[in-house]
């Protein structure tokens, strides 16, 4: 019995997280996952090879302080991603103060197209979590260019927006915030789902929405970038895949008829598990929510056309 137990244990799949992009967000996500998850392997790819190697070395030292000794490698060669359960993509440019996320679209689409091809050459079985902005457009580009099934490619945007919404509601004295989701574009057309909000004494939401929509720019103006909030949001999604939690959360996912829309990636409620997007949850959204979602889809499709999709 003991031998069988050991044998079974040795067959337990190793949890490996790959990263393409070892910059502020990628490295902070890796640092977060190192602390929160029992990951056996982390691989960080970046065009700045020394950055990726340096981050891997620093992360390995941090792990030792936690009594953890995962294999952590960095470099510019995509072959180190082989066997990743999930690849987290933050490769690309970040916006500067005064820019919108959409201003990054043309440049980052070219990067994501190349990254998609290289991920499929090195780790074709991985789920892909896209973070690079504008994330809804980059998730679509990743899906199209990788050729993967739509459940295996998804983006993190509204998860972060929803965390910001919860904080803003808390500061306004809202209690028992069971569900407070931002849906739609991870951008200026994002909206608070009034259909799905579940909390006590919810205030008028117009001002709250404006705060959430533009708070990232305020952070960027002061510290140059956002990465702690994004890292926790990304960790929540990575954890759902690696531990098959089947947690329901807002995610940028490829629609094929859901909510009446197709051929676009946009933030909607989804169940995330070992298969990636396990299910898109088609709640009967009220007319205002549907109008807002339609507005996001229209904007995103116009920008996809500009990118040649
Ligand atoms: N979806 C979200 O909620 C969210 C949150 C925060 C940041 N972001 C986005 O994530 C991206 C990264 O942000 P950051 O602050 O980490 O930027 P950063 O500049 O610190 O890191 C980006 C990294 O990508 C690397 N890179 C560039 N082109 C590459 C390529 N072709 N292959 C591999 N690596 C490449 C760069 O060398 C750099 O290290 C930006 O687009 C930013 O807007 C999205
Ligand atoms: O706003 C940005 O440019 C980064 C990210 O999308 C965020 O919302 O923090």
List PLM regions with ranges.
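Aromatic pocket-lining residues of Rossmann-like dinucleotide-binding sites
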Residues: 33
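N-terminal Rossmann-fold NAD(P) dinucleotide-binding loop
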Residues: 26-27
